Amino acid sequence: VKVGINGFGRIGRXVFRA
């Protein structure tokens, strides 16, 4: 899983959740 800049939170968590 890639926990980085997703925004959507589909891959892992996502750091930036707008």
UniProtKB/Swiss-Prot annotation:
The UniProt GO MF terms for this protein read: glyceraldehyde-3-phosphate dehydrogenase (NAD+) (phosphorylating) activity
- Reactions that this protein is recorded to catalyse: D-glyceraldehyde 3-phosphate + phosphate + NAD(+) = (2R)-3-phospho-glyceroyl phosphate + NADH + H(+)
Q: Where does NAD(+) bind?
A: R10, I11
Its annotated compartments are: Cytoplasm
- GO terms, biological process: glycolytic process
Is this entry keyworded Transferase?
Answer: no
Question: Could you identify this protein by its name?
Answer: Glyceraldehyde-3-phosphate dehydrogenase
Native source species: Naegleria fowleri (Brain eating amoeba)
